[in-house]
Amino acid sequence: MADENPLVGFHFAVDIQGVIKGYFTECSGLGSEHEIIEHKVVTEKGQEIVMKIPGRLKWENIVLKRGITSNMDIWDWRKQVEDGGVDDARRDGSIIMFDQGLNEVARWNFEQAWPSKCSGPSPKADGNEIGIEELEIAHQYIKREK
C-alpha cells in the first residue's frame, strides 16, 4: 500500500443538481450505520450468548454550514419543501474534496436529497463573528466514489 498524506479537510465544494453549487465552511454527516439487534441464543452445551446482528440501515443527515450572503438558494430550496413539494425538491448531489492544488481527491455522491432544516445566524449586538447559515439535508443513499 502506497503512503499517502491525509487530506486537508477545508477545501471542499457542494454540487446539488440544479439547486446549489458552491463552497461551505463546514460539512458533517457523510456516513451510515446499522442499528444493532441483540439475539440471545443457547449453544448446544447450554451456554447463553448474545449475538449481535445488523438491523435497519440508517443514513446520517448531511449538515452544511457557510457564511451568510445575499444568495437565497438554500432558503428557496427549503421553501419548496415547506410548501408541500418534497417530491419535486428531491435532488442528487455531491460533496467534493480537493487537495491544496485544487485537484479533486475525494467525492461523496448522494441521492434523493431534500432540505430537512435550514437556519440562519444568531446575531449578537456585542459580537463580531461572521453570520453562519446551516442546511441539513436528508437523503436516501450516500457513497464515497473516490
Enumerate the language-model features and the residues they cover.
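Glycine-rich, low-complexity intrinsically disordered segments
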Residues: 1-146
